[in-house]
Amino acid sequence: MSTGFFGDTAKIKYEGPESTNPLAFRHYNPDDVVLGKRMEDHLRFAVAYWHSFVWPGGDPFGGQTFERPWFKDSMEAAKLKADVAFEFFQLLGAPFYCFHDADVRPEGRNFAENTRNLNDIVDYFAKKQDESGVKLLWGTANLFSNRRFMAGAATNPDPDVFAFAAATVKTCIDATQRLGGENYVLWGGREGYETLLNTDLKRELDQLGRFLNLVVEYKHKIGFKGTILIEPKPQEPTKHQYDYDVATVYGFLKKYGLENEVKLNIEQGHAILAGHSFEHELALANALGVFGSIDMNRNDYQSGWDTDQFPNNVPEMALAYYHVLAGGGFKTGGTNFDAKLRRQSIDPEDLLIGHIGGMDCCARGLKAAAKMIEDKALSAPLEERYAGWNELEAQKMLQGGFSLEEIEARVLKADVNPQPKSGRQELLENVVNRYV
């Protein structure tokens, strides 16, 4: 039954590239077959509950611009928000959604009340999922908004805050499992520091390592089959976050023995904040064996903060999905739109239009990436570039068959004097542009 929030809007359909209808897909056709799989099954789109239904449209210089009938802290409002959200998922044809606990339940007076409220709304969500067929991609706990977390959650100097956060995560994993969620995400927005003057780095990292081990232990104890994901971000709200980027998180996982238990949820905007490209973070996660899922958005390249806009750069998306596909595609992960409307975009249909554009952009990127893979447009030059390493002596050198002295002797005996070869960067950039 319609909530009336989106008026008489019909389900969004694919109308093809020539369509000028703003409420239609031009490139995203869920049933299109790409590399032997339906487009919907490749992309696994999800809607972010927080940006789409919780964010009020404020900024540091002004407050709420969005007027939503569910902007009240009550269970009745939470259920209305759920009604609108699930109507939106179905209008859009999004197969998944994601949420923080604080997005979906009213804030209670204490942990017990928060848990009761979460359990109540999970009951409601379970019915909504059964009715709609929409699934939960991942759940997570908001361990950054409430003032109790101002000095961190797992890394807080107060052990009671650590305990409160751990208990909260336990209830959120329970909720995620009950709703059939395919992943559970941890993002450490307050796990870091503002100044080293009041920070014990080793202590805080050890606390964070123990916290994550508790999560993994509990996952196995209850038989949760989903993937535990960490989402890297270098800063904001904290000046320096411990989950800075893919490389940093991998080092952390190795130190605490978790590299085979935890994978990464990589966000485009966070990659930019860390001084990387999106494809760099994806390629590195694949190389290290920790790629899990993506949060799709974009940042304003002239701003120094996380603007969380909808993606609109097809070449960027093509390279991103190239690395997703090259790594074998999503397993339990997907494409979550961690993107929000601009604060002047106050109409309900703006929410649909933003997601439609993002989904079309991703679809174009996916198709371009798939074609590059089919044609070996990038893989063939790469194989040629490293072909020398396939030779017997090179393999022996790489696998420990020669000592440093033996390598020196070979260089002297054979008078090895290598000459440089072109990296052909401009050619490869032109190749990519042919596909997008």
From Swiss-Prot:
Signal peptide: none annotated. Keywords: Carbohydrate metabolism, Cytoplasm, Isomerase, Magnesium, Metal-binding, Xylose metabolism. It comes from the Bacteria. It catalyses: alpha-D-xylose = alpha-D-xylulofuranose. One of its GO terms (molecular function) is magnesium ion binding. Pfam families: AP_endonuc_2. Its cofactor is Mg(2+). The active site is at H100, D103. Mg(2+) 1 binds at E231, E267, D295, D338. Belongs to the xylose isomerase family. NCBIfam families: PRK05474.1, xylose_isom_A. This is Xylose isomerase. The gene is xylA.
